[in-house]
Amino acid sequence: IEANDRYTACPFSNLVIGTDRPLAAQEFGLDGLKAAGVDVTIAKAIGVDPDTQSVTLEDGSRVSSDRLILSPGVDMRWNALEGYTQAAAEILPHAWKAGPQTALLRNKLVALEDGSPVVMTVPPAPYRCPPGPYERASMIAHYLKTNKPRSKLIVLDAKDQFSKMALFQEAWAEHYPDHLEWRGAIDDGAVARVDAALDAVYTDFDEITAPVINVIPPQKAGAIADAAGVTDLPGWCPIDPLTFESTLQAKIHVIGDATIAAPMPKSAFSANLQAKVCAFAVARLLSDLEPTPTTLANTCYSYTTPDEAISIAGVYTNEGGALASVSGAGGVSPLATDKSIRNAEAAQAVHWFDTITAEAFG
């Protein structure tokens, strides 16, 4: 059951914002799933009965199941950042769901007068794709350096540490010293409120106005997770990492960014692997077999220029009903390395994207 007949992928969407990559390269149809024998229903799910694992569709019809797997994605927590509403997002785009918001942010950059500032705000964790804001900052800085050389991006961050921080800062110092300024919480980077009518953001001690403001707001699990009763008070979904079954509702499984699966990050790689582990577990449960413990992994590629990328990887096991990082496994790209390594990782990112989308959509 999918609300849209075409899917717009978030991975690589930052390149749409900052390079000449077309938005169409992010779009995928569902015909491949149908050809593989999957019964695809294009409809919006608006309700879930957790007692029967049945789903109510927007037209009022219901779909029953023995076990239900939810992939809720994320929704923005409107007004968690004062002043940031759905209406405000049409002026200060978040672009944290790929599609029209991606195009809106790109178009605002294109229309920017050279010399005018750009602002990005980054929320506290957790949120979808931990290194995503910093890849986006890199791509926006690249766009400004190439097309609006008198403009600069100011990143206002609610944190003082972030994923692949040393690697990003090394790249920024090399490529964008005049086009990117990052301010952490200790430097008054945490944004307290925004005003879309004034194109303004406010920290504890500063007011900054800019014609282009990219607000990445606090997030939560998508609305269908609330309807199913699988969210906790912070708005995310606790799960059993052996099966990804909700710990709040029996026979309902949750995968992807909506889950509480730390230290496994909210990433596309994680979601894809969680889906496979969950499907395997559900198949065994439906056959009255015990689920088999598995090892999970994650890799996140991030572009720092259109042809250079960095990565972080992790491996995770189930220990006492919670995921734990495997000591000595995974790692990050090396600092101060040859450009050919960064080029190779950029090529690997393309291969990963092509593989994961082929797996998902055929």
Language-model features, listed with the residues they occupy:
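FAD-binding beta-loop-beta segment adjacent to the flavin cofactor pocket
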Residues: G235-H253, T305-A324
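FAD-site-proximal beta/loop scaffold in flavoenzymes
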Residues: T85-D114, I208-L273, R284
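C-terminal auxiliary extensions adjacent to catalytic cores
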Residues: S311-G362
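Beta1-alpha1 glycine-rich phosphate/pyrophosphate-binding loop at the start
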Residues: I1-D39, P124-M165
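A conserved FAD-binding loop/helix module that cradles the flavin
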Residues: G256-T304, A313
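Short glycine-rich anion-binding loops that position phosphate/pyrophosphate groups of nucleotides
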Residues: R6, G73-M76, Q219-A221
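A Rossmann-like FAD-binding core segment of flavoenzymes
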Residues: A36-T56, V63, A141-G235, E290-P291
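FAD-binding core/adjacent interface of flavoenzyme oxidoreductases
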Residues: V40-E135, H142-T146, N214
